[in-house]
Amino acid sequence: MRTPDYLSPTSIGVWRRDRREFYLIYLADNRPPRIPQTQAMAIGAAFDAYVKSHLHERIFGKGANPVFEFTTLFEAQVEKHNRDWAMRHGAHVFNSYRDCGALSDLMLDLNDAEGEPQFEMQITGRIVHSSCIGGIILLGKPDIHFINKSGAFVVYDWKVNGYMSASTTSPKKGYVKIYDAFTLTHSNQHGKSHKDCQMMLVDGIYINIAHYMEDVDQGWTDQTTIYSWILGAEVGSKFTVAIDQIVCKGSGNEFPYLRVAMHRNRVSEPYQLKLHDEIADIWTRVKAGKSRIFDEMTPEESVKKCDVLDLVFKSYQDDHKYSDWFNVMSRSHSDF
C-alpha cells in the first residue's frame, strides 16, 4: 500500500464518492492508468488556457512569463486527442465570456487587488488539527487569488457545466449576476441577480449574504475552502469565494448558447469546522493503513479487501488490445 504525501479537493471528493476508487488511485501498490480526458473535461481545460493567458497578458504584459502563454497552458491541460476540437470550442466559450461582460467584471475586481494577483499556482500547506500530530498536508491549484484594497481575501475559479449535454443546464441558485452570452434577444434575467440573492457590498465586493457557498454547491465549497486555507486563511475565518459558472444549452448548431452566472459567497464557520474534522479523519485513516480504509468493515475485512485491490492492475498491459476497455470498465465514473 502506498501512503499519500497530501490530500487534495479531488482526492477528498473521490473518498466520499467511492472508497474503492480512492484506494485504487491513491493507495494501491499497482496504480491504474489515468482514464483518458473526455470532451466534457477538455472544454473546461481549454477555456481555462484561453482566459488565463489573456488575463496574465493584460495585467503583466505580453511575454512576462512563458508559463502563461496560451500554447503552453493549452498543451499542458488538453490531451492530444482532444486538441483540435477543444481549440475551436474553447475559443467559443472564451469569446462568449468576454463579449457578454463577465471578463470586464473580473478585470474590475483584479484592478482593485492590493499587489499582484496570483495565477494558477500549485501549492501545499500544512493545516493544524488536534487529532493529527504534525498536521495535515493539503495540495491545491487555485485559479486566481488576490486580496483587494478593502482587505477582502478572495479565491476565484471557473466552472463550465453542461457543454456536452443535449438538454439545458441551469445555473446554481443565488448568483449575484447572470449574463446571457449570446447575440440573440436576451432573457429578462440578463444582468440581474437570482431571485433568492440578497446582495451586499462587503469589503469592496458584492456578495450574496442570503446563502453561504455550501448552500450552493458542496464540491465548489470544499475546493475553494481548501484553497483558501492553503493560501493562509484561518479555519473558520471570513473569506470570499468567487465562481463564474458557465452553463450551456443547445443551439441547433455546432456551438451551444452560453450563460455566465457569477457566484460570490462566504463559507460559514460551522461548515469549515466540519470539513476540517472530516479531512483530519481521512488523513488519519490513510496514514493508519489498510485496516482503517473501509470503515463499514472490520479491520480484518478491510485489510483483505485492500489486498485484493492491490492486485487489480498488477497484470495490466498498456499495449494489450483490451487494455483501454478494461481500464474504463473497471473504474468508477462521475461524468457519464
Placement of each model-derived feature along the sequence:
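Short catalytic/ligand-binding loop motif for oxyanion handling, primarily in non-cytosolic enzymes
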Residues: 23-24, 32-33, 162-167, 249-253
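Hydrophobic (often cysteine-bearing) scaffold residues that line and stabilize catalytic clefts
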Residues: 39, 43, 86, 220-223
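Short amphipathic alpha-helical segments and their helix-coil junctions
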Residues: 1-2, 19-33, 155, 201-211
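A non-catalytic, helix-rich entry segment at domain boundaries
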Residues: 46-128
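Nuclease catalytic cores
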Residues: 5-60, 120-121
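Metal-dependent nuclease catalytic regions and adjoining charged, substrate-binding loops involved
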Residues: 7, 180-221, 225-336
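Non-catalytic protein-protein interaction segments used by genome-maintenance enzymes to assemble
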Residues: 121-222
